[in-house]
Amino acid sequence: HIRNHFGSKPFKCNKCSYSCVNKSMLNSHLKSHSNVYQYRCADCAYATKY
């Protein structure tokens, strides 16, 4: 929580300039670089990564 106050973002993406305060946010961001769509609608062609 304290990192939010000081602007420290030690978790950095190795594929772009994104950085964040915790590892779970970085893991969520890394999905944006993936071509894997985990969630698909059973009734149509809609799919999303997260």
Curated annotation (Swiss-Prot):
A zinc finger (C2H2-type) spans 1-5, 11-33, 39-50. It comes from the Eukaryota. GO terms for biological process: segmentation. Its main location: nucleus. SUPFAM superfamilies: beta-beta-alpha zinc fingers (SSF57667). Keywords: Developmental protein, DNA-binding, Gap protein, Metal-binding, Nucleus, Repeat, Zinc, Zinc-finger. GO terms for cellular component: nucleus. InterPro entries: Znf_C2H2_sf, Znf_C2H2_type. GO terms for molecular function: DNA binding; zinc ion binding. PROSITE patterns: ZINC_FINGER_C2H2_1, ZINC_FINGER_C2H2_2. It is found in: Nucleus. PANTHER family: PROTEIN HUNCHBACK, ZINC FINGER PROTEIN. Belongs to the hunchback C2H2-type zinc-finger protein family. Gap class segmentation protein that controls development of head structures. This is Protein hunchback. It comes from Schultesia lampyridiformis (Firefly mimic roach).
